[in-house]
Amino acid sequence: MTDTTVEAPATPRLKQKYNEQIVPELEKEFHYSNPMQVARVQKVVVSMGVGAAARDSKLIEGAVKDLTLITGQKPKITKAKKSVAQFHLREGQAIGAYVTLRGERMWEFLDRLLTMALPRIRDFRGINGDQFDGQGNYNFGLTEQSMFHEIDPDSIDHQRGMDITVVTSTKDDKEARVLLKHLGFPFKEN
């Protein structure tokens, strides 16, 4: 007779580090009495604006393909709300794509971003630590998609940048910065 036990999926490495090391450290640092008060990452939004898609609608397909490879999730396409003649833009035309990551996929993406993608940037000296929005959320941009190992450098048709928003449960920028620093975000020291 064969053993039919099913193993639970492995917990993402960064999530495990957060639960076992970071929560107790932040609890002490901010004098919380309950671990549920500690700030946590709620979601990560990865978006690509493809302004040139106003002239060539095929470009949006490349952005969707790249985002799917990078995040492991199918992106939602954003469309123009208004027509703007100067930009050759019509209402309802596809001009970008975004993915909202939560749960296990979010932790896996953050781990890959921090350990593999950011170190691959040429002349990388850290990310700007001033881009918090006043609500505890952090935004930063990347100039090209080739830093992710999922993207084959030979198959890139256009260089596309992307914006990444990390939404935290705290409303305090200082606390959010400490959380992200503990997670491994390489902020520039001023």
Curated annotation (Swiss-Prot):
Q: Which GO terms describe its molecular function?
A: rRNA binding; structural constituent of ribosome; tRNA binding
**Keywords associated with the record:** Ribonucleoprotein, Ribosomal protein, RNA-binding, rRNA-binding, tRNA-binding
User: Do the record's keywords include Ribosomal protein?
Assistant: yes
Q: How does it assemble?
A: Part of the 50S ribosomal subunit; part of the 5S rRNA/L5/L18/L25 subcomplex. Contacts the 5S rRNA and the P site tRNA. Forms a bridge to the 30S subunit in the 70S ribosome.
What function does the entry list?
Answer: This is one of the proteins that bind and probably mediate the attachment of the 5S RNA into the large ribosomal subunit, where it forms part of the central protuberance. In the 70S ribosome it contacts protein S13 of the 30S subunit (bridge B1b), connecting the 2 subunits; this bridge is implicated in subunit movement. Contacts the P site tRNA; the 5S rRNA and some of its associated proteins might help stabilize positioning of ribosome-bound tRNAs.
Q: Name one GO biological process term.
A: translation
Write the lineage as a comma-separated list.
Bacteria, Bacillati, Actinomycetota, Actinomycetes, Bifidobacteriales
- The source's domain of life comes to Bacteria
Pfam families for this protein: Ribosomal_L5, Ribosomal_L5_C
Family from the record: Belongs to the universal ribosomal protein uL5 family.
Q: Which GO terms describe its cellular component?
A: ribonucleoprotein complex; ribosome
Name used for this protein in its record = Large ribosomal subunit protein uL5
